[in-house]
Amino acid sequence: MATTIPSPFNWDSSFCVGNNELNEQHKKLFALINALDANRSSASALKELLDFVVMHFKAEEDLFAKVNFSDSTSHKETHDKFVQDALGLKTVGDAEIQFIKQWLVNHIKGSDMKYKGVL
C-alpha cells in the first residue's frame, strides 16, 4: 500500500524511526531528493544522492547486525533492489522523481518503522 507523499516533500516527525543518526540521514535523503528534483539534468546531484543512499543503507545494516535485528535479511533485500533500480536511471523526469519519493516514503513508514524501538 502506497503512503501519501508529503507536499512539500520534507521530513517531519511522522518519519521518526527512534534513532537520531538515522533520522538525520533520512532528513538528508529528503534534501538530496529535493536538490535532484530542482536540477534533474545534474549528473552530480544524482550521483550524490545515490552515494548517500548506499552509505545510509550500510549504516542501517551495520546497526541491524549489532542488535541481531530479525528482519535484517528482508530489509537488506529491499535496499539492494532499490539501489539496482536507481543505478539504472539514465534520465530524471517526473516519473523517476515520483518513483524515488514514493519509494523513500513507503520504505521509511513501512520497513524502517519495524526497527523503531529496537535500534
UniProtKB/Swiss-Prot annotation:
The residues listed in the UniProt record as binding Fe cation 1, with positions renumbered to this chain, are: 26, 56, 60, 112
Q: Do you know which Pfam families this protein is assigned to? A: Hemerythrin
**What keywords sit in the KW lines?**
Iron, Metal-binding, Oxygen transport, Transport
Cited SUPFAM superfamilies: Hemerythrin-like
* Residues binding Fe cation 2, per UniProt: 60, 75, 79, 107, 112
Q: Which PANTHER family match?
A: BACTERIOHEMERYTHRIN (PTHR37164:SF1)
Q: Which family does it belong to?
A: Belongs to the hemerythrin family.
* Stated name of the protein: Hemerythrin-like protein
This protein's gene is called: nfa1
